[in-house]
Amino acid sequence: HKAIRRQRQMCIRDSPSGSGKTTLMNIVGCLDQATSGRLILDGQDISKCSDNQMSDIRLQKIGFVFQNFQLLARQSAMENVCLPLTYAGVPKKERRERAAIALERVGLGDRMSFKPTQLSGGQKQRVAIARAIVNHPKILLADEPTGALDSHSGEQVMELFQSLNDEGVSILMITHDAEIASMAQRTVEIRDGMMKSKEVAET
């Protein structure tokens, strides 16, 4: 079985199309169930969870960051970040307070009322990260989070990920960028249905 260790950055890179990257992310993200084996997340055996339990785990313990941001175009940055809290049944006043803190955390305190069309690519990704962390997840899943960004914006996102990791958030990320992958504590390649892992020495 696989256990997701706390406070780790693991990067999946250079794996060919169809190798299972997305399937692995979906299983870790409690979107799909594995057909065999076990997944232990924060001490809980996910393979034994019902659909409702998996939904609760997604809301409470997992944040998702996508390459193309997946923001609602007609909603402000504040409203986009509030969405997970709305699904979790958090009262409106608390939702806005927590969303404001998350947006401040990613350096967008002055862009809360802006809609996605008024933001740069890097700013959109930071809104997406704020949305992912507003529920204080144990693990952050990021699928090519810098793939649609210029190098400067990509560096800013990775600095933010490093800061979150230092605070105890585990990060599982897919990337084809060797430089981005080198920042992780562990890299994994998936080939022919097998995972090949490499630990990165800490400095």
Describe these PLM feature segments:
Residues 1-8, 12:
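Single conserved hydrophobic/aromatic residue that forms the stacking wall/gate
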Residues 29:
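Helix-to-loop junction immediately C-terminal to a conserved catalytic motif
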Residues 37-45, 151:
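Conserved ABC transporter NBD signature motif
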Residues 75-83:
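Short coil-to-helix segment of the ABC ATPase nucleotide-binding domain corresponding to the Q-loop/switch region
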Residues 115-125:
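Conserved ABC ATPase signature
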